[in-house]
Amino acid sequence: MADGKGDAAAVAGAGAEAPAVAGAGDGVETESMVRGHRPVSPAPGASGLRPCLWQLETELREQEVSEVSSLNYCRSFCQTLLQYASNKNASEHIVYLLEVYRLAIQSFASARPYLTTECEDVLLVLGRLVLSCFELLLSVSESELPCEVWLPFLQSLQESHDALLEFGNNNLQILVHVTKEGVWKNPVLLKILSQQPVETEEVNKLIAQEGPSFLQMRIKHLLKSNCIPQATALSKLCAESKEISNVSSFQQAYITCLCSMLPNEDAIKEIAKVDCKEVLDIICNLESEGQDNTAFVLCTTYLTQQLQTASVYCSWELTLFWSKLQRRIDPSLDTFLERCRQFGVIAKTQQHLFCLIRVIQTEAQDAGLGVSILLCVRALQLRSSEDEEMKASVCKTIACLLPEDLEVRRACQLTEFLIEPSLDGFNMLEELYLQPDQKFDEENAPVPNSLRCELLLALKAHWPFDPEFWDWKTLKRHCHQLLGQEASDSDDDLSGYEMSINDTDVLESFLSDYDEGKEDKQYRRRDLTDQHKEKRDKKPIGSSERYQRWLQYKFFCLLCKRECIEARILHHSKMHMEDGIYTCPVCIKKFKRKEMFVPHVMEHVKMPPSRRDRSKKKLLLKGSQKGICPKSPSAIPEQNHSLNDQAKGESHEYVTFSKLEDCHLQDRDLYPCPGTDCSRVFKQFKYLSVHLKAEHQNNDENAKHYLDMKNRREKCTYCRRHFMSAFHLREHEQVHCGPQPYMCVSIDCYARFGSVNELLNHKQKHDDLRYKCELNGCNIVFSDLGQLYHHEAQHFRDASYTCNFLGCKKFYYSKIEYQNHLSMHNVENSNGDIKKSVKLEESATGEKQDCINQPHLLNQTDKSHLPEDLFCAESANSQIDTETAENLKENSDSNSSDQLSHSSSASMNEELIDTLDHSETMQDVLLSNEKVFGPSSLKEKCSSMAVCFDGTKFTCGFDGCGSTYKNARGMQKHLRKVHPYHFKPKKIKTKDLFPSLGNEHNQTTEKLDAEPKPCSDTNSDSPDEGLDHNIHIKCKREHQGYSSESSICASKRPCTEDTMLELLLRLKHLSLKNSITHGSFSGSLQGYPSSGAKSLQSVSSISDLNFQNQDENMPSQYLAQLAAKPFFCELQGCKYEFVTREALLMHYLKKHNYSKEKVLQLTMFQHRYSPFQCHICQRSFTRKTHLRIHYKNKHQIGSDRATHKLLDNEKCDHEGPCSVDRLKGDCSAELGGDPSSNSEKPHCHPKKDECSSETDLESSCEETESKTSDISSPIGSHREEQEGREGRGSRRTVAKGNLCYILNKYHKPFHCIHKTCNSSFTNLKGLIRHYRTVHQYNKEQLCLEKDKARTKRELVKCKKIFACKYKECNKRFLCSKALAKHCSDSHNLDHIEEPKVLSEAGSAARFSCNQPQCPAVFYTFNKLKHHLMEQHNIEGEIHSDYEIHCDLNGCGQIFTHRSNYSQHVYYRHKDYYDDLFRSQKVANERLLRSEKVCQTADTQGHEHQTTRRSFNAKSKKCGLIKEKKAPISFKTRAEALHMCVEHSEHTQYPCMVQGCLSVVKLESSIVRHYKRTHQMSSAYLEQQMENLVVCVKYGTKIKEEPPSEADPCIKKEENRSCESERTEHSHSPGDSSAPIQNTDCCHSSERDGGQKGCIESSSVFDADTLLYRGTLKCNHSSKTTSLEQCNIVQPPPPCKIENSIPNPNGTESGTYFTSFQLPLPRIKESETRQHSSGQENTVKNPTHVPKENFRKHSQPRSFDLKTYKPMGFESSFLKFIQESEEKEDDFDDWEPSEHLTLSNSSQSSNDLTGNVVANNMVNDSEPEVDIPHSSSDSTIHENLTAIPPLIVAETTTVPSLENLRVVLDKALTDCGELALKQLHYLRPVVVLERSKFSTPILDLFPTKKTDELCVGSS
């Protein structure tokens, strides 16, 4: 209570503490009072305490309750208690002290009503009283105290506690609890003290119960009792507890315990974990408590750990504490020094050594000099990563310790100088060396000689040389070499350095200008000599930068074995010159002439030449500046005149701010993306940077160029402003001339300063820094200089010299660079005069204001907005000769029929520019009548139609349409809306079209009609490939009367490099046919660069066209195509061309020495390139051979027919112009992919014998032999052709960036197939989204709808159309299957009429098995061949002229190779690919099946063979996979089980093949084992899965299986499998009104009414076997027929067998029920019938059903319980219940021999969810596998056989469910409600097992009065 109030508080505090000190202090704290050693004897005087306390209480009662009275009472109470408790005999009488505390507590409790808590001493006295009593109890054992003492104490304590509780004081609660339980008898406490593991919750509960104070008492008591381990355990738990807020006391107790345990490695590690500051606090506390020894042990231990771990945290404080404690405990100085030496040995840092030296000097002074020197030596020897400053401090320390030893001081100073060379250090070293030497006095030396020698050796270890025998001059020279980095040689120093200034000047002059010529050497020498003479007098010592640079480069002379600096190599070589012969000191070559020797020596020099003053020299000597500007601003004025002249000569070559003023770029702050095909515009530069990094990383040449130009920017060293080029920087640096070059560029503040620091200080004083753009008129202001520089850079970017070639967006600020770039595109005219555009600057300047008067237009274009040549008529990027223009004008007046206008030809100046991105009209920016303005950033490609522009308005040039619009945007909307057939922008990335430059001549041309020709297609069957095709435009001129208007032909642009390459190659083979004036290429396109601007070559080729008359006929271009060499070398100057890519690859490798990796990165090798194109079906091939084979096989083109076609076509060349109708027909035929390309005709194809297009002529002269191949199905062959052309025009999609489109239905080719829904979409994604959102389709059903949509789009292109014959239905289909499905879905056509519908198409190819009694029929020969090899063992050579027909989803394509078929299935029918060609993961995807017991040929009769044959014939219908021909013998199940380990902890899968002993853990592993080891195919594994995969689970007991009893079971199971063979039932017309879901069920054809009912579960079909069978219709009529039946020797009782229902995604019904978790899709009633009956009608033969029937299923519909008709297992179950009521005694007829063995399925338990599971009963005498009762339900279910439900068939007769409900209600008392829910949600789970309870089974079934029972009554 030292913190109490006033004197009274102090007295009370003393008194409160006194009981603990007096009673427990004299007694408890002594070790003699430890429990068991304290005598128990009564002590006199305790009786006098009661009256004293009563008197105090009486006095208190007489007074009013106040703070003063309470304070007085507490003071008197403490004094009285101290008087009695401090009796000198009290410590020997525990009973006496216990009585004292009892009375004191009782008295205080009775006085509590008269005390107030406003007095702080009240609670304080009570708390101290409780603690003192508890401390006494810790030392007393209950057994030591007599009952007459202990019991009254407990009773009094409880009464006092109750009294205090009335006033809210529960201080006695802990004491009462402890005394009742026993002070040391708490079970948790006992566990802790016995060091047993304790739960954290229990520890926290104990801590919360007793509190920190009581626990501290316990720990102190344990320490006093020397119970160190117990105290350690308790204190550690308290220190780590989160229940105690302040754990410092417990931490200290824990550390104290650890110190008591030393030496102990674990204790040392625990101490080392504590933070150093906490350790220091604990040391201080221990010292204050008088525990110096513990504090010293702790300090020594922690300091040792710090020294060993090199930790310097609080190292000085720790070392100081240690020294004080060491000296206090052991005053001996020698011991202290020895300990310091020991610490120095283990120290690893110099900081620790310094701390030790300091405490030694403090404690020992001169006596510790030797140890201090020893520690210094140790510090010098440490090779740590500490800085050199610390070692210099060590040297200074040594010099201070030994001030009289001159040699040591010299060594220390030299070491310090060598570590940190400085002029001051050199001066001090010089002073020491100038002092006279001293002789070492060994006798009077302060340190031993050995230690001194060790010190000198440690110092010399830091020297790069050994100056022991050097004089001061030599050492001084070496020191000067080191000082050369920061100091120069003075005049005095140079005298000893043998270096003349003339030699160095000659050397520097030579190093600077040797490579540029020697004509100015004399001038350079004189100039530099003068400069150095002027500066030499002013130089202080160590101020030359030249010498510092020289010292960095040295060479080793082989002649004199010395090292010299390279700057003196010539001077050094003179030493070795003899008889006029020069010897190279580096390579010892000899030269007779100096002119040859000097250049040779310079080759060895690595030092860079000094070019400090080159710019001044060159200006004076050469008159031109090519170097950098002088660094000093003062050197600039004298060059201003030359710079100005220079700038005048260069200014016209660069874009400058003065030229930007005329471009109307003011107040524009937009950043368009420079990337190819990207028209994004950003309002901030940072977003452009992010966009470039994300979208145009490494594959965009234009983006790379932009970044390169950005990196070329220069920065001013004075104002940090950025400039576009070095020219702009030089032009700007004139601003910084003068003595104050640093300038503040903020608005209205142009203060100048002489240093950058002054400028920075000035900027800090600015309130608001605002920077304005330098462009006059631009008022945009920035607060950040970086943003300003980006803004100004964009101004230059907008007005730069920009290349306008297609695909090239490169820009330049210099016209020379721009012209050099254009030369890369080979666009120079024949005379090479590319500077015509420069000459036309003046004329173009006059048009600038008219051309560009809206700055926002520049927002969308980065193109040629150069002021000088903005719109030049003969620009370098689109040049046409005058002769060409005149020819075009003449042709417009003539009657020529066709004029070829290429997409990249010279007609680029006639383009119609598409929609602008902004809303400004074109009338403000239109040029004169002779020019067309073309903004370059377009969202859409130009359309291919004729549009006339007369300078003021746009006029539509189509027949009968003369609409006029003011701007291009309105014209484009008109074209999209009114002429959608011709305006067909492809879905390609938005790409900037470059503006065409205007033509000088006023041309009047005819209307151009564009006919796009598809360039390329791919051979891939992927529907996603080939969507984006590049259109080759052929503009055919017609004489239409629009000659007075200038025509503008806009052509579509390709968007990818590979298709552009194809387009360029096509240009080589084009000819200008059907015209009087023909054009031919004067040159060939050979040397194309590989950059992104490949179109530029085509432009240059077209621009060089020379039109001349050609009277002779052109040769066949098809033959020219076949003779072409499309793969050409991309290097400039190399004209090699090759037919194949491989040949080009070898050319690069051998001719140009490219690596293969580098070649594969070239453009030609990056893309799929198919240059050889079929002119009929537009398919492309990579080889000419493939194209010839295609012509021969697909189009039956031979040499005779080709010759005939050529003759006819040549006649057409001279017949004159084609008719307009014919031209339109050709155009629509070329478009070909759009269903609405000709609205009057359903389909339009060019006739092969007519000259429909120029491409027909190309292939008309093929000279290959004719071999007509047998195409069995015209539909199939045409379908393959359609697949090849998929996407050229049929899938029109819209680019993302377009504005609103006004499109009608004809331009939305993706239509919804629902009858009442007229929605149509522009792309497939929109249609799919429509199906899923509007019609609630799920993902699995979209496959069929997608095919329907494609079928509808391909309707126009089909050769043979199947039209629906119903009235008011004009739908047409590609194949008979689609028609049959439509009739069944839409017109309720019964499936009986299906053969009539299917007969229209004729069977493509039906292959019947030729073996007797085998009804199998196949569609493909491979299936028949497979069937013959597997079923009939016919392995002879089977010849085939047949092909593989794809019958999935109604597809009729034919393939001759299996690889092509597999690729087709992967792309077109991907859902079936896994089932047809890839092994499934059986463990995750197959249902639980019943076990097919091993096949034994002897026990199986003819019936089993028939069953196996029928199974095989159906399981391999769609397989097309060959299996192993050799028969494989399998083990029996018993043999397989004996291979397994009986007590294995995991599942086991033994190999069932005879002779193989493999046992694996996973099902996938055994499947892989069969495939790899036994070469089994996937189809065979699927068939034999249950025989081959046997799962032995954990805990399975392996027992003997009696073979004699297993055989009947095998036989019966096989018989039941045979009986469950699939049958197809006829559906009566009367049932057609009710939708029927696809089910696969079988019923016995005959029912014996007298036969006794028996419930019997049998084997369920293999899920994959069912998967290949087709959908079946369930009907309970008597007309049931079976195509294949098995003869059963012993007919078993009637049994209902169920087959699994394939769910909509093709898997088994295990996942079928899982799909119910999704929302049930809504579907119309007609569509429900459509789905259900469509699969019925597609079944042509029961033995061959296309795979599609298992994928496309009807929608899961809501289930009406009234219409529920149980069948299969449910039916038999109900029937069994009903019969059991009538014939209860029939159960006696059950025979155990007919019970099948328990199925051991290998499926995982995950597939069990939602399945009907039937578990066959196990015979007692024939158990195969015993299931432990402890196994979980999932483990039991894994061994059960799955029987999927069949509950959706709807008929009129509905049996009652009451019996079933009653049975469930009575038998399943605990789960009846759950069972009803399962039935309600169509997910019943019924498990039949052997009864495990004693209740007779008859008692479970209802009585006759079932109506009286209610569901759920139990």
From Swiss-Prot:
Pfam families from the UniProt entry: zf-C2H2 (PF00096), zf-C2H2_ZN292 (PF25420)
Tissue: Widely expressed in fetal and adult tissues.
Sequence positions bearing Phosphoserine: 41, 632, 634
Entry's Gene Ontology cellular component terms: nucleus
Oligomer status and interactors: Interacts with RIT1 and RIT2.
MF (Gene Ontology): DNA binding; DNA-binding transcription activator activity, RNA polymerase II-specific; DNA-binding transcription factor activity, RNA polymerase II-specific; zinc ion binding
Note from the entry: In some small cell lung carcinoma (SCLC) cell lines, there is an intrachromosomal rearrangements at 1p32 fusing the first exon of the RLF gene with L-myc.
Numbered residues of crosslink Glycyl lysine isopeptide (Lys-Gly) (interchain with G-Cter in SUMO2): 622, 839, 1423, 1599, 1611, 1696, 1762
Annotated GO biological process: negative regulation of heterochromatin formation; positive regulation of DNA-templated transcription; positive regulation of transcription by RNA polymerase II; regulation of transcription by RNA polymerase II
Chain positions of all zinc fingers (C2H2-type): 582-604, 671-696, 714-736, 742-766, 771-795, 801-825, 954-979, 1127-1152, 1172-1195, 1310-1335, 1362-1387, 1407-1432, 1444-1469, 1549-1574
Low complexity bias (residue ranges): 893-907
Family matches, as InterPro entries: GH-ZnFinger_Regulators, Znf_C2H2_sf, Znf_C2H2_type
PANTHER family hit by this protein: ZINC FINGER PROTEIN RLF
Protein's job: May be involved in transcriptional regulation.
Compositionally biased residues, Acidic residues: 1252-1263
Domain of life: Eukaryota
Family recorded in the similarity comment: Belongs to the krueppel C2H2-type zinc-finger protein family.
UniProt biased composition (Polar residues): 1629-1642, 1731-1741, 1796-1807
Keyword list, A-Z: DNA-binding, Isopeptide bond, Metal-binding, Nucleus, Phosphoprotein, Repeat, Transcription, Transcription regulation, Ubl conjugation, Zinc, Zinc-finger
Localization per record: Nucleus
Biased composition annotated in UniProt, kind: Basic and acidic residues: 521-540, 1003-1014, 1240-1251, 1277-1289
Primary location group: nucleus
Record-given protein name: Zinc finger protein Rlf
